């Protein structure tokens, strides 16, 4: 969640695979809340995974505080649980995956692809492996 753009991703119903969904322009808080509320009404997620821009040394800086402040407002407004995930290197990982798949920034913007990386990290960590040998 940046100052200008918010990338959104969505999981499949089995919570196995995350896919980029949309990029929202970050206007004023009211308009941004309305746009996110529309996505939540359409897709009906159980919770929101929000990337937290933790600094490279692992501390919570001013940008992370801004994200947390807006996320708390979002949680109250939508009555939905928020889970924070470290978003360090998510854009780099998204760009690498886009390059590996032959997609470029004109096909999928970094913001939505990075959101999918963050969500996929959460899914991989919270879901047990589907198939055991």
From Swiss-Prot:
It comes from the Bacteria. The keyword Cytoplasm applies. It holds the Pfam family RuvX. GO terms for cellular component: cytosol. GO terms for biological process: rRNA 5'-end processing. SMART domains: YqgFc. It is found in: Cytoplasm. Its EC number is 3.1.-.-. Signal peptide: none annotated. InterPro entries: RNaseH-like_sf, YqgF, YqgF/RNaseH-like_dom, YqgF/RNaseH-like_dom_sf. SUPFAM superfamilies: Ribonuclease H-like. Keywords: Cytoplasm, Hydrolase, Nuclease, Ribosome biogenesis. GO terms for molecular function: nuclease activity. PANTHER family: POLYNUCLEOTIDYL TRANSFERASE, RIBONUCLEASE H-LIKE SUPERFAMILY PROTEIN. Belongs to the YqgF nuclease family. Could be a nuclease involved in processing of the 5'-end of pre-16S rRNA. This is Putative pre-16S rRNA nuclease. It comes from Dehalococcoides mccartyi (strain CBDB1). The lineage of its organism: Bacteria, Bacillati, Chloroflexota, Dehalococcoidia, Dehalococcoidales.
